[in-house]
């Protein structure tokens, strides 16, 4: 099991934040009339595969952070999927409120990685500014 202390507490809190974020994204997808399926945790590239009423796929990467977070990390696989299928990709950002799930806020950032060029950068992940990325988002789409 986990060793008690700050690291174990952080891991437990992180898992709770991620769970609330995914739950919020699943609910938003259902509200849009789509059929979302949560992917296994080890799925590379996206967290939710959603199907539109027309049968089209939407690939959703969910990032949840406690309100006030400065940044977040996105993996190279997540960026590459968003670049390869830009029209079908959504980055869903969920600001998790300490006041409970009913106060969580959600933004969709469509086609965020369309024009990104990592060149020969030997990166495994990229850290993005939460507020600047949040500002590019919209209500669920």
What are the functions of these language-model segments?
Residues 1-14, 19-20, 24-27, 31:
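Charged, non-catalytic accessory extensions
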Residues 9-16, 36-43, 79-82:
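Short, contiguous acidic/charged loop-to-helix segments that flank catalytic cores in large enzymes
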Residues 20, 32-34, 62-110:
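Catalytic cores of nucleic-acid endonucleases
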Residues 25, 29, 47-50, 57-66:
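Conserved catalytic cores of phosphodiester-cleaving nucleases, focusing on short active-site segments
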Residues 39-53:
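Beta-rich nucleic-acid/ligand-interaction surfaces
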Residues 45-46, 56-57, 88-91:
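Short, surface-exposed beta-edge/turn micro-motifs
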Residues 50-54, 95-98:
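Short acidic, glycine-rich loop/turn motifs
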Residues 88-141:
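Domain-level recognition of nuclease-like catalytic cores that cleave nucleotide substrates
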């Amino acid at each position: 099991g986990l060793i008690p202390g700050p690291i174990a507490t952080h891991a437990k809190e992180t898992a709770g934040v991620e769970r609330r974020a995914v739950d919020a994204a699943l609910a938003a997808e259902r509200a849009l009339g789509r059929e979302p399926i949560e992917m296994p945790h080890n799925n590379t590239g996206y967290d939710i595969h959603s199907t539109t009423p027309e049968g089209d796929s939407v690939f959703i990467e969910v990032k949840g952070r406690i309100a006030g977070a400065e940044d977040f990390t996105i993996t190279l696989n997540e960026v590459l999927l968003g670049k390869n299928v830009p029209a079908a990709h959504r980055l869903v950002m969920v600001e998790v409120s300490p006041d409970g799930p009913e106060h969580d806020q959600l933004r969709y950032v469509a086609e965020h990685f369309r024009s990104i060029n990592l060149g020969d950068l030997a990166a495994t992940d990229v850290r993005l500014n939460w507020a600047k990325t949040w500002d590019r988002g919209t209500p669920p789409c």
